[in-house]
Amino acid sequence: MSYKIVTLPTYRAVGLSWEGTFSDIDPDLKNVIKQSEDRADELVYKVNPGVQLGLNYHVIENGFAHYAVYEVSEEQELPNGMVEIRVPEWTYVKTTHNKGDNIQQTYMDLHQWLFDSDYTAFKEAGVNYYDPYMPIKHEHYPVNSDPNDPHFDIYIPIVKK
């Protein structure tokens, strides 16, 4: 597995959000992701229409907040029932989870890389996170990704130790 340090500029994303526990992921979160995909045509100013973002923030005990969104330009109006999130410029470690691989193993390998590296996961000031190792996980899914065996890029915000 390869890891790359990248900096992404600030961006705006619009779509649907979900908050819940790990036990609520199936079917609740999967339904929200599907609804976001189904409503993607309402977003006429998508910056990269071929990529759906899964932005995860571990701000709930035994769970997380998830944004199933698309990056959009400032011209995009907020459709009824959708939410907006602005992601600041952050430095990330980027890796790819490949179709057919075990997702849990991909994240375990990433955790080990972080532990061995000169970096640690970034935490926003004043926010209480329930995952001390990777409290923010951004996943970039190609729209043709198989939801039952996906391939996607993982971005973890980081800072120097």
Which residues fall in each region the model found?
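A solvent-exposed interaction/effector surface
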Residues: 1-161
